[in-house]
């Protein structure tokens, strides 16, 4: 008799869910592993360079898993506790009262909660507040007192965190400590920029009117600049987000050279009279016209 093949969670996902066209993975198994972890309620952390698609991937995964999407960005606040917990308000008639945050409401439902740029918190409050939310305790204390009211986390709430880690990200911690990492039992995914062919496919899917010639030139430019960045000759790289911006300008009628200059040169300013980085990038841009 033929051996019985046991159907697993991974095989079911691979047989029933198509990889989204609007996002490209270097390896398809990454996508299905993420879906498996969402299905199992295992929080995941995605790291990688700015503009490689971490945040847009969160929205895509929320849609596929039919969860309500909430995003909380920690790069735009100096008070994480107010963003996560809420604020005390005062009204002449009602007196003092507590207004819960969006986060308090989000964790009580079947939601996909994106904790964006967690390494941008320099107060230390973020980790302290979120530890019991992300681990087995599954609760959020509304203040720091011992008898604080708390909110239980819905068993179907899922947490997806993103982090930019590295010297080039202003205000970002160098790394996440071990206690933080241990809370993401679904694993830590290190996204990199896509291989040239897949990045080209992505920008052509996002901008169907873009021709193959210009798509190839855009991703070739990005690869050359990234190689210079990897060799420590530039302090920052060209992101996929920047490639998409260039492609949109080209589709709208701007020349490729002008679109590259308009989008990319502001990331390489002249600093204290030193224009060496800008000159290098301009040279790469000009070579795209050859």
Regions found by a protein language model. Give the residues of each.
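Alpha-helical lid/collar subdomain of P-loop NTPases
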Residues: 1-25, 40, 195-290
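AAA+ P-loop NTPase catalytic core and its hallmark functional loops
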Residues: 1-216, 220
């Amino acid at each position: 008799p033929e051996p019985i093949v046991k159907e697993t969670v991974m095989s079911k996902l691979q047989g029933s869910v198509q990889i989204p066209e609007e996002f490209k993975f270097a390896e398809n198994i990454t996508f299905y592993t993420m879906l498996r972890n969402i299905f199992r309620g295992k929080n995941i952390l995605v790291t990688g360079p700015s503009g490689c698609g971490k945040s847009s991937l969160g929205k895509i995964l929320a849609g596929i898993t039919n969860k309500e999407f909430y995003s909380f960005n920690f790069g735009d606040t100096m008070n994480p506790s107010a963003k996560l917990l809420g604020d005390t308000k005062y009204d002449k008639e009602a007196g003092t009262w507590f207004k819960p945050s969006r986060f308090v409401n989000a964790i009580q439902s079947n939601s996909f909660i994106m904790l964006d740029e967690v390494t941008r918190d320099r107060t230390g409050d973020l980790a302290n507040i979120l530890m019991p939310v992300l681990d087995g305790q599954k609760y959020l204390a509304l203040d720091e007192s011992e008898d604080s009211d708390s909110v239980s986390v819905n068993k179907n709430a899922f947490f997806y965190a993103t982090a930019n880690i590295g010297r080039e990200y202003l205000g970002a911690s160098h790394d996440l400590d071990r206690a933080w990492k241990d809370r993401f039992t679904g694993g830590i995914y290190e996204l990199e920029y896509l291989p040239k062919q897949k990045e080209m496919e992505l920008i052509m899917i996002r901008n169907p009117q873009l021709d193959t010639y210009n798509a190839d030139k855009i991703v070739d430019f990005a690869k050359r600049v990234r190689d210079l960045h990897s060799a420590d000759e530039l302090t920052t790289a060209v992101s996929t987000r920047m490639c998409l911006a260039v492609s949109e300008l080209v589709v709208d009628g701007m020349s490729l050279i002008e679109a590259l200059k308009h989008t990319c040169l502001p990331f390489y300013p002249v600093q204290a009279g030193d224009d060496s980085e800008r000159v290098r990038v301009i040279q790469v841009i000009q070579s795209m016209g050859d």
